[in-house]
Amino acid sequence: MNRFAYRTTGLALKALSWFSKAHVTIHGRENIPREGSLLFVVNHFTRIETLLLPYWLNSLTNLPVWSLADYELFKGALGTYLDNVGAVSTRNPDRDRLIVRSLLTGEAAWVIYPEGRMVKNKKIVEKGRYMISSAGGKHPPHTGAATLALRTEFYRQRLHRLLKEAPLEARRLLSEFKIEDGAGVLTRNTFIVPVNLTYYPIRAKENALSDLARKINDNLSDRLVEELMTEGTMLLSGVDIDMRFGRAIRIGECLTCPKIEHDIGSRQVINFDDSIASRNQMRREAIGIMQRYMDEIYGMTTVNHDHLFASMLRHIPYKNVRSDDLKRKVYLLADQCVSMNQTHYHRSLQESQLPLLTDDRFGKFREFMTLAQQTEVIAGADETLVKNRSRLTNPFDFHRIRIDNPLHVISNEVEPLEFLQRCVR
């Protein structure tokens, strides 16, 4: 890793963060362990995470923060940039060894996205199970972050035992990881820290970034245009980003299975890529840890007015909806949910919601209706609204959905919040 380039790029990221009008609110920073090796698992909705999240996390932890990024991004100037900020390609043959080594030594924290790729439609639950939708199809969340954390702690505990019982094998292991001093390895613990990022509002429109890109290249792909319109608007128009840290998972507590403990203490030579006797037990532990951090990540979604309006509109069974009825239902929903304090809410929902029933002085209903009409989810602008049900249920092109039907995305985002869904129904 080029540390000079990392620091220089960090200055550029700081400037970009200042330039952006995004407002970032941090919640739960007390959940970040002050000591230990940290692996952050984060939901992935925009390129903003790839560009700015390492800088934000570095400012909170004072640690270099490296990340695992899709191999397709490592091309041209973007690839150089990603190298400089500590990103590692998913196809790097040494990626696992690099991650485990740096977690053993604590030289860097890591960011991994368990969905594997950006989830533009925010569809991550199907029939009560986590199932990620993407342009390439559907797949369960990856267990890679859990597996890497388990392998890190496996070797940490193994070194701790072998330095006393089989020092030659311990020294061989340290040499394999290119670690000169094992003392720093033994005193650390490995933690997975779940992180949720919620963006509000989600709006896509032409902006300075998309205009500039068109002037440079008038043959942009639809995918790039969509990303510039959606994420450029977020950065330049002032999106609220709630960054919420969940309870850290101490990985050492997940290695107590007798078969795993036997492998940890084995005096036989175990190379990094060797299959071990307890691999099935390790795999089961990885799946369990993945379920824990997925529950934590998506349980921390910060609910906002768009979530309530979109969810209520989707669940109302009638095609024709009176606007006053919709406002009353959302007012009661907000009052019930916030008072019971079962999930997290945007700061605008912490205040009195009476304006929804009176003059809509903060424009929450008006802004939602404008978006619904522009994207043809709703027709009519007076007392009776005509709902286009297909716009809230039918699938859309993965790389166009944030432009063509953001309300579908918004309602998908809160599907994992069972308490909210019960209140909506």
Model-derived regions: residue spans:
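Membrane-interfacial terminal anchoring regions of lipid-handling membrane enzymes
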Residues: 1-66, 70-74, 80-83, 91-425
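The substrate-binding groove and active-site-proximal loops of carbohydrate-active enzymes
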Residues: 88
